[in-house]
Amino acid sequence: MSTTVIKFFMSKSFRTFLKHTAKDFHNQSVNPPVVRASTIIFKSMREIRKMQNKAIKNPKGGYFDYARSGTSTTYILQKILTKLEESYHVFTTQTGFGSVFLAIFSVVRPGDEILVADPVYNPTRVLTENYLKEFNIKTIFYDPHNLETLQKNITPKTKLIFVENPGSNTFDFQDLNKIISIAKKNKVYTAIDNTWGTPYYLKPIK
C-alpha cells in the first residue's frame, strides 16, 4: 500500500510530496486509516512464527505480530519519513526525546565517551551530563564554533558526536560537513537532533 504511494511520488517536489503522500490508493481513501491495535490476530501459532521470521529478515518493517513492532499506520509513517529524510530507513519512537535516548544508547557502552554540542536541548544535556555518568559514560561539551577543540577532545574512547543544527538554546548553525569529516577521520559515529531544521530545511544524511 504505502510502497505504491512512495513510488508514485518519487519524482515530485518536496511540497507536492507533502500534499499527496498520504493518499491511500489501495483502500481508495483520502488518507491511510489510523490503526489502533495492541494485539494482532492470527489463525494459528504457525502463522505467528511466519510473521516473526519475516520481520527478522526484513528490518525495514511491514510485518507485525504485536503493537511494539508497529501497525500499518506506523509503517506508512516510517516510509514517508524515510523519503523525506532521504535515508535508508526510519524507526519511529513514542516521543522525540525517546529517539535521542535510543540514538545515544545504541552506540555507547560503559567506559565510552561522547561529545555533545554545548547549545544542545536542555533535557539532552541533563541526560548526557547527569545520567550517563551513572553508566560510567563520560560526556564532553564542545563549542560548535571552535571545532579545533572538538578534534582535541576526541580520544580512543570517543564513540559519538551529538549535534543539533540549529542549536536549541542559541539557534546557531554548525559546520556539519566539517564535523562529519572529523568524525569519519577518527571513526566516530555522529547523531543529530534535527527537530528545528526538519527535513524541509535540513537533510543531514544527504
Where are these regions (language model features)?
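Conserved N-terminal alpha-helix of the aminotransferase class I/II PLP-enzyme fold
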Residues: 44-98, 128-130
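Alpha-helix initiation/capping motif
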Residues: 25-27, 66, 70, 143
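Conserved PLP-enzyme active-site core in the AAT-like
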Residues: 6, 15-22, 89-206
